Amino acid sequence: MNRLFKKTLSLMLVIVMTVSLGVSAAAADQTGAAQAEGPLGIVSAMSVELNALVEATKISKTEEIAGNTFYEGVLNGVDVVLVKAGIGKVLAASCAETLIDTYHVGGIVFTGIAGGVGDDVNVMDMVIATELVQHDYGTETNSGFEWNGKAGSNQETGMIPVDESLSKIAYDSAC
């Protein structure tokens, strides 16, 4: 990835959440994750998070769908569709659905400034998920976390696996 893009991303705390959408590891490499399956969808919660990506992308088309602006273009040689979802998982899910149904993306990356991600994470740190959990499907008690939902792939822990090829690309671009 080019220096401008790396520098831009290093200016903010970035949480990268990858969602497995059937991108084959063979199709994903440093030059084009998800290209065999479709463009890469990139979702941000806030304008400040999306603006740096829009500026670094050669935009070919802008489209308004359900009150959201979708930017199609090429970012560092990768076909992408960028969108600001707004804050919250319902808005993110709505944009993810549009990316899948309308743009036929091969994968989705969520990037943004996160609040309350832990004491060991500082501003300008990049955090790349290896697995995810829906935070409100359990309760933290004095005895530990008590899982009470069925949101994740692993019914015992609620953890949701991420696409390893997308995580590797995020990691490699950050280093």
Language-model features, listed with the residues they occupy:
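Bacterial N-terminal signal peptides that target proteins for export
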Residues: M1-M12
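Bacterial N-terminal signal peptides
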Residues: M12-S20
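Sec-dependent signal peptide cleavage junction
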Residues: V19-A36
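N-terminal short beta-loop-beta anion/metal-coordinating cradle
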Residues: G32-E97, Y103
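Proline-aspartate-enriched helix->loop->beta-strand connector
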Residues: H104-V109
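Mid-sequence, gly/pro-rich, charge-dense loop/helix-turn segments that line enzyme active sites
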Residues: G118-C175
